[in-house]
Amino acid sequence: MHLKNLSLLNYKNLKTAEFDFDEKINCLVGNNGVGKTNVLDSIYLLSFGKSYFNPITSQNINHDSDFFVVEGEFKKNDKAEKILASAKKGQKKIIKRNNKAYEKVSDHIGFIPTVIISPADRDLIIEGSETRRKFMDGVISQSDQSYLNKLLQYTKLVSQRNSLLKYFAANNTFERDTLEVYNLQMSSLGQDLFEKRKEFLKEFIPIFNKRYADITNNKEIVDINYKSQLFDNSLANLLEENLQKDMALQYTSVGTHKDDLSFEIEGHPIKKFGSQGQQKSFLIALKLAQFDFIKKISKVNPILLLDDIFDKLDENRVAHIVALVATDELGQIFLSDTHAERTEKVVKSSNQSYKIFKL
């Protein structure tokens, strides 16, 4: 699978742009602020139906316009697939496949498997549990539509239960039967999500460990630990046991929406004990493991977006990463950098076809 061409209209700072891509490696070079990252983000948009960097659609429209259109033609299983994403201020975002609009944007997720590696990934280490859950859910969802649907249902139920708890507090009332309806549905869906996450991590963590060892030449031991309240109790019991607490807080304090991943190096949290270089290697291994996992499950090479990959990494390390991906039936890579010569030196060493676009 690869992206053949891309056209942008009023997407972020890019008023109009068109690209015909190489099916192997594509390099976007230019000074900071010219829109390299926004081109990569537009490809991510065509894959996920949303921006990687700013999920608020209206803020991705060029300041001088009230709409954007992003269109790409992909080749998948020897068939042309045209994907279009458009948005207008005050209106619902539209995602189309071959001129037919999806009823739900979520129905498109997984059709164009894509992995992005970006300096913004550091949030996975320094931010709260929600960021890491989103990563885990994103990897699973690209290869399991049923999981995504259950996750969306569960998230909606949590929001509705929270609204009910606020209603109880505001009106000094309590309706156990109504609450039980939410508890039952949440318990079933939450348990399913928990089991799927365990199953996923059992397969994902060895892939991640191998990637980290490849990148660092086996320098240190890293691990990912799944933290969930459901290891100790069923969600049904947890909801019942924490009812008074939830009533006081006016939100749901227990469930799979509180799960987290603990990223560790030599048995300690990498956030506190890992150097910048170790953290960067950890994140890249995480994303390359995502690439490997999706490829294994979907039998399709994901598109790989490398945003500002030279940030905190030297040329040799970047060349090593490109080579790692290139060794095993390369998919399509998009790479952004400020230095054309440095970029060309790295991609030449991969012995793959490439194009360089100067923005």
Swiss-Prot record:
The places in or outside the cell where this protein is found are: Cytoplasm
Family matches, as InterPro entries: DNA-binding_RecF (IPR001238), DNA-binding_RecF_CS (IPR018078), P-loop_NTPase (IPR027417), RecF/RecN/SMC_N (IPR003395), RecF_2 (IPR042174)
Stored PROSITE patterns: RECF_1, RECF_2
- Positions binding ATP in this chain are G30, N31, N32, G33, V34, G35, K36, T37
GO MF annotation terms: ATP binding; single-stranded DNA binding
From the record, give the cysteines joined by S-S bonds: none
Q: Which residues form a coiled coil?
A: none
Q: Which Pfam families match?
A: SMC_N
Q: Does the keyword Protease apply?
A: no
Q: Which biological processes are named by the entry's GO terms?
A: DNA replication; DNA synthesis involved in DNA repair; double-strand break repair; SOS response
Q: Hey, which family's this protein in? A: Belongs to the RecF family.
This chain's function reads: The RecF protein is involved in DNA metabolism; it is required for DNA replication and normal SOS inducibility. RecF binds preferentially to single-stranded, linear DNA. It also seems to bind ATP.
Q: Please give the name of this protein.
A: DNA replication and repair protein RecF
To which species is this protein native?
Answer: Christiangramia forsetii (strain DSM 17595 / CGMCC 1.15422 / KT0803)
State which gene encodes it.
Answer: recF
